[in-house]
Amino acid sequence: MTEYTLKIKLLKEDAKLPQYAHDNDAGMDLFSTEDKIINPGKHALILTGISIELPENTEAQIRPRSGLALKNGVTVLNTPGTIDAGYRGEIGIILINHGEKNFQVEKGMKIAQMVIKPIVKVNIEEVKMLSESQRGKGGFGSTGK
């Protein structure tokens, strides 16, 4: 396993550093710095009070917490959200309430997970033809049930 250093700046007095719940977890929990109600069918930007400096050639992916989704129908709207290495602003999480009741976000609540991933840069080449493959143009359920 490759280890990187993630630099984190706390922007608010009540902000918390991201935390791994267990040693082998891929994602670290992100915490809300605000109280907010999300009505059913609505979404809201929830601020974390942190900004980060990612290691070179990495990205941060923002992913939902399974417990929020299962128990409340609340998930991250743009999943996975990508934070590029050059971004230095406050991390905000767009949560959507697919449940039937209002959802109360509370200060200090775990609202999402952040996973740090290496990135691969590719050279882009325009071509007239692509090579054949076994799958071809099949998609959207083409492999059956």
Curated annotation (Swiss-Prot):
State if Protein transport is listed as a keyword: no
Q: Which GO terms describe its biological process?
A: dUMP biosynthetic process; dUTP catabolic process
Catalyses: dUTP + H2O = dUMP + diphosphate + H(+)
Q: Which InterPro entries match?
A: dUTPase, dUTPase-like, dUTPase-like_sf, dUTPase_trimeric
Taxonomically, the superkingdom here is Bacteria
Pathway(s) annotated for this protein in UniProt: Pyrimidine metabolism; dUMP biosynthesis; dUMP from dCTP (dUTP route): step 2/2
Q: Its function?
A: This enzyme is involved in nucleotide metabolism: it produces dUMP, the immediate precursor of thymidine nucleotides and it decreases the intracellular concentration of dUTP so that uracil cannot be incorporated into DNA.
Protein name from the UniProt record: Deoxyuridine 5'-triphosphate nucleotidohydrolase
The organism encoding this protein is Clostridium tetani (strain Massachusetts / E88)
**Lineage of the source organism?**
Bacteria, Bacillati, Bacillota, Clostridia, Eubacteriales
